[in-house]
């Protein structure tokens, strides 16, 4: 099947100033600033920085001229995610198949090559301004080589002497790979995009939550999680539900030029406590979880684990509370998670740091606490 998806190849951000964004993501989240394509490599209309950590690859792109497509998008949406790129065996065939399945082309297949190998990319549009690029890699640019520090594509060069890289190697944040990637769409549009992922990319529904699961007194949302066949690529889709006041999804849409987009990127760690402690030390701002959350969480979580024959949470309760981490369990095990505040001035994109101990769900038991924390922030911004 041409649409066999191997992995998340990279996540492309459009940003106003990639040099400064690269410094932020390196300093705050421990990414290595590895490669660059800019004026020095012959790229005349945009600059791109490749940041890596574990199997996570962020590509930060900024316009060098006002005619580059990223210039208009940064004006409309601020900094944010443009492209969740997917590694496939043959990008051209994957793109053809997706278009036959009803997908709309974002750009036609194009191949960049040199004597050592080639990279072919082709894109389709999903909700709002978001694109899925299909990426196939050959020779020196194949995925195993890339994971070992090989060049991203012809036209990139390695970054030498970026001082934070050594510091980040010695003080790792421990982020391993993209766990899932959440989109916000307009009211009434979630099922349309669920069907789109089924029809166009062959995804299947993995989980779903409705406003009974995710509601406070004020705001609610509905969410369905779409996953690729190998479950490596998960794309939850949120829509607002009717509440007394504006939901966080509605707030996102309003500050994202009334356009759907990527709300957050969840990054996986094997050690939530170590990762969060290191990120806090680096000055990352996380949502403040109400103290009352910890009064009932252990009973709820360990009770669920016991009922399904699992061991209790092994992380030290006090450390979990001190670091403000959320815990949830289901029949398969438990998870630990925490959400940053927005990563730019607009209340749009944020990150989630997640650790799974058996659980494959998304922290349903935390939705309420999370919403209360989000609403407190929303109120401070005057967006209720």
Label every PLM stretch briefly:
Residues 36-37, 67-75, 135-136, 172, ...:
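ER-lumen resident redox/N-glycosylation machinery signature
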Residues 3-6, 12-57, 100-101, 109-115, ...:
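Core segments of cupin and vicinal oxygen chelate
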Residues 233-235, 255-343, 349-357:
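Long compositionally biased, domain-poor regions of proteins
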Residues 1-19, 81-84, 145-194, 258-268, ...:
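N-terminal beta-strand motif that seeds the catalytic metal site of vicinal oxygen chelate
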Residues 24, 61-63, 70-73, 85-89, ...:
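A structural feature that tracks compact, well-ordered secondary-structure segments
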Residues 159, 230-251:
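Active-site-adjacent "gating/activation" loops or surface patches in catalytic cores
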Residues 6-16, 49-50, 69-96, 122-125, ...:
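Vicinal oxygen chelate
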Residues 69, 77-163, 170-172, 182-184, ...:
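Hydrophobic, ordered structural segments
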């Amino acid at each position: 099947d041409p649409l066999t998806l191997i992995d998340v190849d990279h996540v492309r951000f459009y940003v106003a100033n990639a040099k400064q964004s690269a410094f932020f993501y390196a300093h705050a989240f421990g990414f290595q600033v590895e490669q660059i394509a800019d004026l020095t490599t012959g790229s005349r209309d945009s600059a791109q920085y490749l940041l890596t950590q574990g199997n996570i690859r962020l590509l930060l792109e900024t316009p060098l001229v006002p005619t580059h497509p990223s210039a208009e998008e940064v004006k409309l949406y601020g900094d944010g995610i443009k492209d969740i790129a997917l590694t496939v065996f043959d990008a051209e065939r994957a793109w053809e198949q997706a278009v036959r399945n009803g997908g709309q082309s974002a750009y036609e297949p194009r191949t960049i090559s040199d004597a050592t190998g080639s990279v072919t990319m082709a894109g389709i549009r999903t909700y709002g301004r978001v694109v899925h690029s299909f990426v196939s890699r050959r020779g020196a640019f194949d995925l195993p080589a890339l994971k070992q520090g090989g060049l991203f594509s012809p036209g990139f060069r390695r970054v030498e002497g970026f001082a934070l890289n050594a510091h980040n190697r010695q003080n790792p944040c421990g982020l391993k790979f993209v766990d899932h990637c959440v989109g916000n769409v307009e009211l009434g549009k979630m099922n349309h995009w669920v069907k789109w992922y089924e029809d166009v990319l062959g995804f299947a529904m993995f989980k779903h939550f409705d406003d009974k699961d995710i509601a406070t007194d004020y705001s609610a949302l509905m969410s369905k999680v779409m996953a690729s066949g190998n479950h490596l690529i998960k794309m939850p889709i949120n829509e607002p539900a009717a509440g007394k006041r504006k939901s966080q999804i509605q707030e996102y849409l309003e500050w994202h030029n009334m356009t759907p987009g990527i709300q957050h990127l969840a990054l996986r760690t094997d050690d939530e406590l170590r990762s969060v402690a290191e990120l806090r030390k680096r000055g990352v701002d996380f949502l403040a979880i109400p103290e009352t959350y910890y009064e009932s969480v252990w009973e709820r979580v360990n009770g669920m684990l016991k009922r399904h024959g699992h061991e209790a949470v092994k992380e030290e309760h006090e450390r979990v509370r001190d670091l403000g981490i959320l815990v949830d369990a289901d029949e398969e095990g438990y998870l630990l998670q925490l959400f940053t505040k927005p990563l730019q001035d607009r209340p749009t994109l944020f990150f989630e740091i997640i650790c799974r101990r058996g659980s494959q769900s998304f922290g349903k038991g935390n939705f309420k606490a999370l919403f209360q924390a989000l609403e407190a922030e929303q109120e401070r911004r005057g967006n209720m």
